[in-house]
Swiss-Prot record:
Keyword Zinc-finger among UniProt keywords: no
Official protein name in the record: Peptide methionine sulfoxide reductase MsrB
Needed cofactors: Zn(2+)
Segments forming domain MsrB: 25-147
Amino acid sequence: MKDRIPIFSVAKNRVEMVERIELSDDEWREILDPEAFRVARKAGTEPPFTGKYHDLHDDGIYRCICCGTDLFDSETKFDSGTGWPSFYDVVSEHNIKLREDRSLGMVRCEVLCARCDAHLGHVFDDGPRPTGKRYCMNSAALKFIPRDQIG
């Protein structure tokens, strides 16, 4: 039996217990395009200013490209000047996991999807109020859903 974890659903406006998603690399390759696989499953980073969401200002929700978990609301998106979509908050702390990342000779805080462990990006303590956080995400790890299509 797969582990069940609490995940917040924006459409239902509540936390539900859902099964964790655990697939092999071959199974993820069948689902994702090559760039999404490289970024989300292999902790890659897209070049700045190249992702499809870094300059998107539409109203909606950003979900995990791998499993569809709600992650960020466009209301918390801001222009960080970095070239990656940046948010000052998550839709729910239930929906992400944080872990120390010591790659590239730096110590950073990696952000992962709580349901499927997809690499989303990193969080920094240089964001705007009210949180002071900057969730610096890869567009390739996200899927945007316009607010009127959330369901």
